[in-house]
Amino acid sequence: MEPIEQLAQAALEQDHLKLRSLVQDLTHAKTDFSALPRPSTTDARLLVISAALAELLSQRNNQPPPAWTKEIGALKEPFFLLKSAATMKHLRILCETQSPEPMRKRLLYAPPHFLEFA
């Protein structure tokens, strides 16, 4: 499984500890996010989440996104990456209105500084 697909799987499972750890590993390794290969998965959700995360990480590292991300559309239904957004109205609204653009355009919702590190 490609690293971007591992990230997407952790996001889909809402396993934020694993997701943050994987992102930190890729960032510390000075990954060329623009060269991330397209996942070979047949799971449309994983493909959409992979594209969103690849674009987000590319953007945050001042790199162009991988070319394959342009071919990937949105999810069929909104997906909140934080479980608590389902029960906390203000958090849900924050995620819906301020989620990073690569995610929001694909109906993935998270807080505005999702996966940013100090």
Describe each region flagged by the PLM.
Residues 64-118:
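Charge-dense, extended regions
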